Swiss-Prot record:
Name this polypeptide is given: Large ribosomal subunit protein uL11
Known partners and oligomeric status: Part of the ribosomal stalk of the 50S ribosomal subunit. Interacts with L10 and the large rRNA to form the base of the stalk. L10 forms an elongated spine to which L12 dimers bind in a sequential fashion forming a multimeric L10(L12)X complex.
Biological role: Forms part of the ribosomal stalk which helps the ribosome interact with GTP-bound translation factors.
InterPro entries attached to this UniProt entry: Ribosomal_uL11, Ribosomal_uL11_bac-typ, Ribosomal_uL11_C, Ribosomal_uL11_C_sf, Ribosomal_uL11_CS, Ribosomal_uL11_N, Ribosomal_uL11_N_sf
């Protein structure tokens, strides 16, 4: 018989840098997960993606065992890295802070494709372009 999922915990943690300190420790402690076991396994799985923020969904079962799924980094993080800026614009409709090319948008869309609710690469690119515009980025050909 399959184990019953008791709780789902969603976190965004820098790749390879999960520690028992807040915010990771308290979130996992409340769910009753072995914090050291999770941090070691997460860091091992994400060591190759250093510098990125990785969303993770942790399924906690009734017997306090757990499994987790790592997702692709958020589109905003990938866009900031591609544009080489620290943060988006405070007023995206007035102040444009950076420019990204369609090729960069396509690359990001291909990376994000497994996690996006898009039927085609074109649809995924439109989603990423929308995120870029809302951050105050200009998309150029």
């Amino acid at each position: 018989m399959a184990k019953k999922v008791e709780k789902l915990v969603k976190l965004q943690i820098p790749a390879g840098k999960a520690t028992p300190a807040p915010p990771v420790g308290p979130a996992l402690g409340q769910a009753g997960i072995n914090i050291m076991g999770f941090t070691k396994e997460f860091n091992a799985r994400t060591a190759d993606q250093a510098g990125m923020i990785i969303p993770v969904v942790i399924s906690v079962y009734e017997d306090k065992s757990f499994t987790f799924i790592t997702k692709t980094p958020p589109a905003a993080v990938l866009l900031k890295k591609a544009a080489g800026v620290e943060k988006g614009s405070g007023t995206p409709n007035k102040t444009k802070v950076a420019t990204v090319t369609r090729a960069q948008v396509q690359e990001i869309a291909e990376t994000k494709m497994p996690d996006l609710n898009a039927a085609s690469l074109e649809a995924a690119m439109r989603m990423i372009e929308g995120t870029a515009r809302s951050m105050g980025f200009t998309v150029t050909d």
